A protein has these predicted regions:
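Amphipathic alpha-helical assembly/interaction segments
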Residues: 1-120
């Protein structure tokens, strides 16, 4: 049931979500906490949650559907981070760190998708 917990992709996505949640809750302006802040939190949550849901599915097609949704949500996170930097809600150093975190999730997630595709 909890097959996702051993996956590096999920572990890193879970860590990324916590960072994004704290950043959006603590650093974004009050007016943005319910706009961009909410969006980045939801997208970050979706990355990890879709891995969980995908790994709970029985068919490879369903697993791939949710893993692909996770990958798309990760792209959304990357764009939200870009917007946060453009609006000066985060520093350049924070931006670079978050982009690196996104890449740390992307690499094992794409490997997981490729491996799942090969089993089907």
């Amino acid at each position: 049931m909890l097959r996702h917990q051993n996956l590096i992709a999920w572990q890193r996505a879970d860590d990324l979500f916590v960072k994004l949640h704290r950043l959006a809750s603590e650093r974004f302006p009050a007016a943005e906490r319910f706009e961009l802040g909410s969006q980045v939190r939801r997208a970050g949550y979706s990355v990890a949650a879709n891995i969980v849901e995908g790994m709970a599915r029985r068919s490879v097609a369903q697993q791939l559907h949710f893993l692909n949704m996770s990958e798309a949500s990760l792209a959304e996170v990357a764009y939200c981070v870009h917007v946060a930097r453009r609006l000066n809600y985060i520093t350049q150093a924070e931006y670079i760190e978050l982009v690196a975190e996104v890449q740390r999730v992307f690499a094992p997630l794409t490997c997981l998708i490729r491996r799942t595709r090969q089993t089907g």
